[in-house]
Each structure stands twice: as C-alpha cells, then as structure tokens.
C-alpha cells in the first residue's frame, strides 16, 4: 500500500496555482487599504462596506492558509469560491461608490437659459415680419421722376397735337385738282364732298378748300408745273426700277439714284 506524502502533494499544479494567487492577492492588499482610508476620509458612509471587504479579505487569507494543509481537490474548490466572493464584493463596492457620488455630489452642469415660450416666439416673428415689410416699402417706394429727354418731349407734343395719329395731307397733282373741280361742276349731286374725299383719299375739308378756291394759274405757271411733275414722276419711277418694282426705261435712266450719285462724284472730281 502506497503511503501519502505531504511534500509531494505541495508540488502539484493546484498547489502552485494557489500559491501564485495568494502572492498576487497579498501584493494588492496595501492598495485596497489605501483606497479604503481615502474613501473613509471622504465618505464615512462607506465604512461598513470596507469593513465587509476587509472581513472578506481576512476570511479569504485564512482560507488560503488553511487550504495548504487540506487535500488538493478541496483546497482548489474553496479558493475558487473565496475568489468569486471577493470579486463580487469589490464590484458591489464600486457600484455603491459611483451611485453615492452621483446622488451626493452632482456634477457641475452648464447653466442653460430658459427656452422662450411660444407667445414670445410669435411676437418676435411678427416684429421681424413687420420690419421686413417696412424695409420693402422703403425700397419699393416712389422713385424720383427723371428728367425727360428731348425726343420724349417731342413725342408727347405730337400725341397731343395729332390725337388720331400722324396723317399728313396728301399732295394732289394739278390734273387731280382740275378733275375735282370738273366733276363737281358737271354733277354736283352725284360727286359730293364726301364722295370726292373718299375717291381721292383726302379729308373732306381739303375738298371744300379746293372747290372754294378761285385762284387759277397762268399758262406759264401751268407749263412749269407740268415739267416739275414729269421730273418727279421719272425720279420715282427710276427709284422703283432699281428696287425691281418697275421696268427700266431710257427716259428714267438719267434720274436713277446711281447715275445721280456717280454724276455728282464725277463733277466733283473734275
């Protein structure tokens, strides 16, 4: 029968782990003691919690010391239970410390000004709208009248003078004047003033003045007038022929605008 050796039992893996855990916990005990004294000086209410912690630590140290003489299986189970109890007690202690700090000494929160009520917001919005409306009225107010230019003054004067529009009097030829007098003398009932005005496209007042006029030109004046009207006719015909509206003729060729222009230049060069 094999005898049990106590020295060989201490060299097992569970025993080595117990010794390591005991050395680590022994090194952390001074820090726990300092933490306890600091908390007691600031918060006396935590003394009971630290007492329980010290009691648990003391019981844990006793259990570790007694576990060296026990069997490896029982010592390992007890060390695990004690370690779990110590961890639970430390977590409870830290939770209590944080809750007590949050309740007893509240943090300095920044002072926030009170929010404006809805009525104040509405009043401020109404004042802003009114100010904007006033600024808009000032900006879109009556602008100073600008001084009219010369062409604008002339245009207004023509509108007042010719309310029905610009309708210059038509210049009638001597033959047309003689024809008006002849028609009115032959059949005055048929060729009345409105009919003659519509036929010759002039105003009725112009027809009345032509019929009332008693002035008659002499033969020399009639001949001179006839020549002037022929030249006028040829000049207009030559202008229309250059535009392609009338055929060109030898009679109207000297009165064309091109010939008149180049003849003047030739005469000037000479």
From Swiss-Prot:
Superkingdom, natural source: Eukaryota
Pfam family, one: Neugrin
Annotated S-S bridges: none
Biased composition (Low complexity): 59-79
InterPro entries named among the record's database cross-references: NGRN/Rrg9
Keywords, in A-Z order: Mitochondrion, Transit peptide
Signal peptide: none
Compositionally biased spans, kind Polar residues: 117-128
GO cellular component terms listed in the entry, alphabetical order: mitochondrion; nucleus
Region of interest called Disordered, as start-end residue ranges on this chain: 59-152, 248-270
Claim: Transcription is one of the keywords in the record: no
Nucleus listed as a keyword: no
Subcellular location: Mitochondrion
Family: Belongs to the RRG9 family.
Purpose of the protein: Required for respiratory activity and maintenance and expression of the mitochondrial genome.
Protein name: Required for respiratory growth protein 9, mitochondrial
Gene: rrg9
């Amino acid at each position: 029968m094999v005898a049990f050796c106590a020295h060989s039992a201490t060299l097992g893996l569970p025993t080595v782990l117990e010794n390591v855990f005991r050395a680590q916990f022994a090194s952390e005990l001074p820090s726990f003691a300092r933490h306890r004294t600091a908390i007691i000086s600031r918060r006396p209410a935590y003394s009971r919690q630290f007492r329980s912690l010290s009691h648990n630590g003391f019981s844990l140290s006793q259990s570790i010391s007694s576990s060296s003489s026990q069997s490896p299986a029982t010592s390992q189970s007890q060390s695990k239970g004690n370690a779990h109890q110590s961890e639970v007690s430390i977590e409870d202690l830290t939770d209590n410390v944080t809750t007590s700090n949050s309740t007893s000494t509240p943090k300095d929160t920044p002072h926030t000004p009170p929010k404006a009520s809805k009525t104040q917001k509405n009043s401020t919005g109404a004042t802003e709208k009114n100010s904007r409306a006033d600024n808009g009225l000032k900006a879109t107010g009556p602008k100073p009248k600008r001084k009219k230019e010369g062409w604008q003054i002339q245009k207004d004067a023509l509108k007042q003078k010719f309310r029905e529009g610009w309708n210059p009097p038509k210049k009638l030829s001597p033959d047309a004047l003689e024809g008006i007098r002849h028609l009115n003398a032959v059949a005055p009932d048929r060729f009345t003033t409105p009919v003659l005005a519509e036929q010759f496209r002039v105003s009725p007042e112009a027809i009345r003045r032509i019929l009332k006029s008693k002035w008659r030109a002499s033969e020399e004046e009639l001949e001179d007038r006839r020549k002037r009207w022929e030249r006028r006719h040829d000049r207009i015909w030559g202008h229309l022929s250059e535009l392609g509206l009338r055929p060109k003729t030898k009679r109207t060729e000297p009165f064309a605008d091109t010939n008149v222009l180049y003849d003047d230049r030739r005469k000037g060069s000479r």
